[in-house]
Amino acid sequence: MGGLEKKKYERGSATNYITRNKARKKLQLSLPDFRRLCILKGIYPHEPKHKKKVNKGSTAARTFYLIKDIKFLLHEPIVNKFREYKVFVRKLRKAYGKSEWNAVERLKDNKPCYKLDHIVKERYPTFIDALRDLDDALSMCFLFSTFPRTGKCHVQTIQLCRRLTVEFLHYVITARALRKVFLSIKGIYYQAEVLGQPIVWIAPYAFSHDHPTDVDYRVMATFTEFYTTLLGFVNFRLYQSLNLHYPPKLEGQAQAETKISEDTYALDSESSMEKLAALSASLARVVVPAIEEAEADEFPTDGEVTAQEEDRKKELEAQEKHKKLFEGLKFFLNREVPREALAFIIRSFGGDVSWDKSLCIGATYDVTDSCITHQIVDRPGQQTPIIGRYYVQPQWVFDCVNARLLLPVAEYFPGMQLPPHLSPFVSEKEGDYIPPEKLKLLALQRGEDPGHLEEEEEEDEDDDNEGDVAAENEEEDVEVESEEEEEEEVHLSALEQHRLEEKKPQVMAGTVKLEDKQRLAQEEESEAKRLAIMMMKKREKYLYQKIMFGKRRKIREANKLAEKRKAHDDAVRSEKKAKRTRPV
């Protein structure tokens, strides 16, 4: 009565997947082109739940794709472009072999090319979706922008990545969107808040590159090809939101100031890019009519809503204060410090920054300027100090941004041992170990005295105690004899008094026992908790025990870290003490 009986592996999960080779043959593409197409379209392999069924009983290692994804790729117009490019390469190779140079030039002029605009719109229907997926795009573009001009990747790709990243940095500076910075072994982590979306990316340090051989640069270049298109769309929309020219243009005043030294630093074709990359000048805005923002009406609300609004207002005020952290301060960067990272951070928080004119284009004032408040140095004793400015190490700038306030500069003077650089991306929960430096920072944020001089006071007390030991020993020898005599007299009198009191009948006064309400409440709560645990089901009790075991383990780990830190501090303190007492 039913339909035709289907054979094995022709229904169920076996029909939902297709192997990579079958998919490649269906699309009539080579393996590199198939990989490229999947990267551009965002199609990734899937691991079936029942791999043996999908693999028709075989256990061989194979890569599977969803068959609906492959059907989706069949209608992609880029597939035809890939085939046209294969024909173009074949014709070009034949023309080179026959030395037909006119045909070579004609073929190069008619080289097939394609655009990824429709793919970007397809993968990110809204602008917020694009912002949420911008982390990897920024990290990859910042990486490619630092590559040297070698045969590993095209020069045009490197230049495009450099231009797009500089444009994004200028947007962050203009919008004051930077929130957190962290120096790590891999590079510098940044976090910016763009239209309410947190975006985190990593920028590598400006070191010379030694390209590893175990990396597939073609795959990375394919990702970069898509990411550059995406970042171009995003930059255009972001510049529009701030009424900025796109492509970006410097303000007329900044262009006039740098026009004198234009021929010295770069060619006419590169000078504008060099000035933009300096990050020292502001961007020109599109003149638009000013629109007065309507103030929101305030209505009487409940107490809870009012408290939430007050907390929100305080948070916004703190955020606005954080955006103006370096406002009114003028910085000068020495040659040995990372110029681009510091210039980007300082300008993102309203500060003015400059450097030596021979170092890079875009310097706005000299080292002799009397208005300089902070000079960033990393080599102590290299310059003659100028009165009226602070000389600090670069870490001070990064720590101030993460602390949301201007930290004391005493610990960051040149030659000083720097405090630990705490990560702003770590948030301690209840029961976690909090290092003493984080506690001091929290105290500073609350406006309290963190007590930086506790260790020095303890060391001074130890020294004073050592000096007083000899004098106290002499006094103790004199007082020992008199104390022993007094103790014997007191002991004899106490025995006599006790013997007399035993002969007399005594009436002891009763004591009123006051109930400790807090202790009783705790006992009732613990008893109720014990009864609740007894009434739990077996599965619930097992889950509860796992939760409590995790909490106890976290407490043990926190205590272990605290003990290690205490042992380290004691060792450092004893080492300092030994150095101080050692004869010169």
UniProtKB/Swiss-Prot annotation:
Chief location of this protein within or outside the cell: nucleus
Comp. bias regions, Acidic residues: 454-489
Family matches, as Pfam families: BRCT_2, Pescadillo_N
Protein's name in the database: Pescadillo homolog
Region annotated Sufficient for interaction with MAP1B, chain positions: 312-414
Cross-link (Glycyl lysine isopeptide (Lys-Gly) (interchain with G-Cter in SUMO1)): 513
Start and end residues of each stretch annotated as Sufficient for nucleolar localization: 1-257
GO BP terms: fibroblast proliferation; maturation of 5.8S rRNA from tricistronic rRNA transcript (SSU-rRNA, 5.8S rRNA, LSU-rRNA); maturation of LSU-rRNA from tricistronic rRNA transcript (SSU-rRNA, 5.8S rRNA, LSU-rRNA); nucleolus organization; protein localization to organelle; regulation of cell cycle; ribosome biogenesis; rRNA processing
Subunit structure: Component of the PeBoW complex, composed of BOP1, PES1 and WDR12. The complex is held together by BOP1, which interacts with PES1 via its N-terminal domain and with WDR12 via a high-affinity interaction between the seven-bladed beta-propeller domains of the 2 proteins. The PeBoW complex associates with the 66S pre-ribosome. The PeBoW complex also associates with DDX27, PES1 interacts directly with DDX27. Interacts with IRS1 and UBTF. May interact with MAP1B.
Domain of life: Eukaryota
Renumbered residue ranges of the record's region Required for 28S ribosomal RNA processing: 1-54, 535-584
PANTHER family xrefs: PESCADILLO - RELATED, PESCADILLO HOMOLOG
